[in-house]
């Protein structure tokens, strides 16, 4: 047994990729994607027909240039998702345009539109997770969508207050970003990269213990890892989403059994409180790291989303 097989005994290993070749190779149950991954894979020969189909769809829908770009993007998400769902048994996480991260109503409308497109191809809601940035508006939109039978993956989680708000809203799954949290502390507090204290891992523990203590049903999926030790440190978490590179490394790594699982300690000193909007915003604002990393994460996804938009725009202008 290798390290990957050992981890799979306790934690669902999700592949963070849009690469069909790697997904076929490692056969994960579930897959996550984001604008950066879609941009990377959109340049491949395999995805070119999917891009052209999205363009054709958008042109048929008509409307102004903005409508064309929105429709092309949405259809591309569905096209890629359909291809991936053909080779996995579980779910795919599809990210909503991050420009809607602060618009409650627009997030709901876009999510329902994308789900409707999937449904039109015979794909049920239970195969899709709608990824939304964990802003206050995003969390409230997810709360509404969950009540409507649309499960969500709240991403860019950098603080316990975001996680609590998601759990209170009965969100299906959250994705704490382990590596990016640690990056911030290394940069701002000169934390040694080899330090045994990993703030990103600590955040996942804190969230997981809190959920366990108070019986929340929201799943915790660790994301954004920088090294193997971070991954191994949260074995026992509901899920982890990792790149094909990490999957390959774990697959070739000799077995190292873990003594202290994340599930062992269910103690949490934090009291359960229902968060109102003003309390959420105040507590979140006090966490410099979380504010900075959420903002940065949205900007980075937007950067890559704009590159996809530019591709569609060129195709539109060229006829």
Curated annotation (Swiss-Prot):
Q: What is its EC number?
A: 2.2.1.2
The entry's localization annotation reads:
Cytoplasm
Source organism superkingdom? Bacteria
Q: Name one GO molecular function term.
A: transaldolase activity
Q: Which InterPro entries match?
A: Aldolase_TIM, TAL/FSA, Transaldolase_1, Transaldolase_AS
Q: Tell me the organism's taxonomic lineage.
A: Bacteria, Pseudomonadati, Pseudomonadota, Gammaproteobacteria, Enterobacterales
- What biological processes does GO assign it? carbohydrate metabolic process; pentose-phosphate shunt
The active site lies at: 131 (schiff-base intermediate with substrate)
Q: According to its record, what are the GO cellular component terms?
A: cytosol
Q: What is this protein called?
A: Transaldolase
* Gene3D superfamilies in the cross-refs: Aldolase class I
